[in-house]
């Protein structure tokens, strides 16, 4: 089934053996529909079963305007999503699986087809031109079909601020990337990040009825605050509240 897909593909052949790592590269870099289906069949046994898992996960993420019918995004009735839902999905991906950037930032790379006929090289080229055109780009994924037109979920990082810009239904690929760049530029212009790298020292805390009369306290992590209102972050006051 995977070997018969249309659209963007890496031309997998029936009986071909590939690693999961290679298939993720094919999906992330070259938008390979055949690699998507091969992964779906490997994970869930069939594309339909995997699509059911996709819809369940989408519902759990609050993607209220999304319904998946296939695993690769080719045009089909009732297959739909929204820019907001794509942003939710993208945020989950880059937050829970930051290693995706190791794939989404590949510009060009070769894979090796391994079939009964032997081995052959196939070149992958990233469909996300922002990787080369936008200085702070970290990914993430392009998409285009006759109905959806030109789309992209673009991720970028500057000064520890990570942003997602989603463009859908652009008339051509140049507009898609130009609009994504403009959105990211705007986001970076209005966002500033405060990180407390010198938090107040924490005292020991008294314990009643415990083995130890006092325990040491520590911070779980660095306190961060994202400001989009243009406030003077130098005026932030620190207050320490203990139980």
Question: Model regions: which residues?
Answer:
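Active-site-adjacent loops and short helices of periplasmic peptidoglycan-processing enzymes
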Residues: 1-96
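Domain-terminus/edge residues, biased toward the C-terminal soluble/receptor-binding domains
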Residues: 63-64, 75-80, 84-243
